[in-house]
Structure formats: structure tokens, C-alpha cells
């Protein structure tokens, strides 16, 4: 795949940076947008080379990477959705297929309602749709506690709590917050507070209002939305969110290899296989 072309687009309150990678040989496939929230484009660096048979667009959300946040107030899933729309509009490549990971798998839902013509097939991989969970009241308190911990004690203490939250299997008990705080060192984080409070996840996205999708409106949008889950993440909150979205839409969930970040491997997830993830993605898109 040739080197990407990198451009920017101005949106209300931010300047977004996006990349377009063209295939060496033009083919029949619809262009593919791959994005996360708040994960920046470089989080998909292991996946994108395995998608060289089609045009691939990636971008950094307004809170991440190379994008510039000019106004941090009023952040919401709907704001992120309009940003994604503006990126596709700027490329002139729509309609696009989409792989949306984690928070982006929530972002695509208001996007589908507002700009259905942008979208072909949408793979919504492990959306943390807290409002659809049976234990949503507990999870909302846990998310607020992580954000409050970040404000009070900084990155390491908050990330240790967040990681513990996202790897927990099954519904959260009412007394979960009564447990001792995790040691940041157990997760490879420093317990020292570096004084910064600009983390994209802990300082921005966790403070957004929860999003409750309208299943009737999404089904009527005409967008093919495929809720997806990781084969290795059964029982975790984002996996449960994917299953709940599938139930809401009346469709079967699609299983992908790996865990919540199955498109990238490393010391933290050596069994993830980006090539296998890409192969599954191509197969799902080509079933359309």
C-alpha cells in the first residue's frame, strides 16, 4: 500500500487530521474508514497494511493525536459523529464502509441517524453502551469514579481503575466500589501524579453524557450496522455492549478474533492477530 496522503479539515472547535491510503491497484471495494474514540489513527497501524486491497481512511479524533482541540466544552458522541461526517465529506469518498472500535462504535450510531448517506456497512466493534446494560447504574458510578480519580490523583491511579473496569467479566456488583483501589504498578502505570489533566479518555471522553441508541430509528436509517464482539473478551463491559446493541437492532452479533483491541498485538495481548482480524473484516464487508 502506498504512503498515505495526510490532510486536515476544520470543524467547529477543532482541526482534524486524517489520512487516505489508496490501493496499489484499484478494485471493486467501497472505501473503508477505520477509527476509534479516543484512539488515534496510529492505533490501527498493525491492521491497515492488511487492508491494502481498498482505499482506507483513518483520522485522529478531536481529542487525540495530531488533531487540534480548540474548544473542549460540550463534547458528546453527537459532536464526534459530526466530526466523522466532516472527514468523509472532506475526502469526497462517501459512502464508506466503517470499522468503528470502542467509543467510535457508539459514535457511528448518531452518525447513522444524521448522515445515513455517508455510510455503507458499519462494523461496530465492542461499543461501551452503558445505557443498554443491566447494571448500567453501577457502571455509570464506576465511570464517574475513574474520572474523579483522574482529577484528584492523575493518570496512573485512574488508568489502573479503568483497566480493571474494562477487563472485569460479568455484571458489576453493587459493592464494586468498596473494593481496595488497584495498584497502578500492577498494570505498568506510575502512581506519581504528573500534573497533567488533558488525557483524551480520562479527561474528555469519560465526561461525555451517556448515549442511549434508538433501535427503531437505527433500523429505519437504512444503514447496515453489524454489532461485533471479540472472541477473547466474553463477559467484559464492551463485549456486553456489543451483544446489547445486537439485541436492540434485532441482528446477530459478529465475532472477531482477539479481544477488545483484536486488531493490534503486543506484550499486553500477544494472542491478538491483526492479519486474522483483517481477514474477518474483509469477509464481513464482502457479505453485503
Per-region residue spans from a language model:
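Active-site loop/turn elements of alpha/beta-hydrolase fold enzymes
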Residues: 61-63, 127, 258
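Glycine-rich phosphate-binding loop signature in dinucleotide/nucleotide-binding domains
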Residues: 26-27, 91-94, 288
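Conserved hydrolase catalytic core segment
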Residues: 94-134
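Alpha/beta-hydrolase
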Residues: 138-252
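Active-site loop/oxyanion-hole signature of alpha/beta-hydrolase fold enzymes
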Residues: 63-97
Amino acid at each position: 500500500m502506498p504512503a498515505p496522503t495526510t490532510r486536515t479539515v476544520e470543524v467547529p472547535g477543532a482541526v482534524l487530521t486524517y489520512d487516505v491510503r489508496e490501493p496499489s491497484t484499484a478494485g471493486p471495494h467501497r472505501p473503508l474508514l477505520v477509527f476509534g474514540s479516543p484512539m488515534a489513527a496510529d492505533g490501527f497501524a498493525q491492521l491497515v497494511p492488511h487492508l491494502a486491497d481498498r482505499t482506507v481512511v483513518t483520522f485522529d479524533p478531536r481529542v487525540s493525536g495530531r488533531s487540534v482541540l480548540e474548544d473542549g466544552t460540550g463534547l458528546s458522541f453527537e459532536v464526534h459523529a459530526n466530526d466523522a461526517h466532516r472527514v468523509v465529506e472532506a475526502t469526497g469518498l462517501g459512502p464508506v464502509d466503517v470499522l468503528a472500535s470502542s467509543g467510535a462504535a457508539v459514535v457511528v450510531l448518531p452518525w447513522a441517524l444524521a448522515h445515513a448517506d455517508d455510510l455503507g456497512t458499519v462494523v461496530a466493534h465492542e461499543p461501551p453502551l452503558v445505557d443498554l446494560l443491566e447494571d448500567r447504574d453501577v457502571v455509570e458510578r464506576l465511570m464517574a469514579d475513574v474520572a474523579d480519580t483522574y482529577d484528584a490523583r492523575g493518570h496512573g491511579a485512574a488508568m489502573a481503575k479503568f483497566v480493571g473496569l474494562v477487563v472485569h467479566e460479568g455484571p458489576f456488583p453493587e459493592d464494586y466500589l468498596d473494593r481496595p483501589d488497584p495498584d497502578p504498578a500492577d498494570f505498568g502505570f506510575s502512581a506519581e501524579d504528573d500534573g497533567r489533566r488533558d488525557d483524551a479518555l480520562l479527561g474528555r471522553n469519560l465526561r461525555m453524557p451517556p448515549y442511549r441508541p434508538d433501535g427503531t430509528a437505527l433500523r429505519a436509517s437504512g444503514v447496515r450496522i453489524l454489532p461485533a464482539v471479540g472472541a477473547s473478551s466474553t463477559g467484559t463491559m464492551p463485549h456486553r455492549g456489543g451483544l446489547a446493541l445486537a439485541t436492540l437492532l434485532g441482528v446477530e452479533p459478529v465475532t472477531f478474533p482477539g479481544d477488545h483491541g483484536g486488531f493490534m498485538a503486543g506484550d499486553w495481548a500477544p494472542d491478538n492477530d491483526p492479519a486474522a482480524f483483517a481477514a474477518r473484516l474483509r469477509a464481513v464487508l464482502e457479505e453485503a
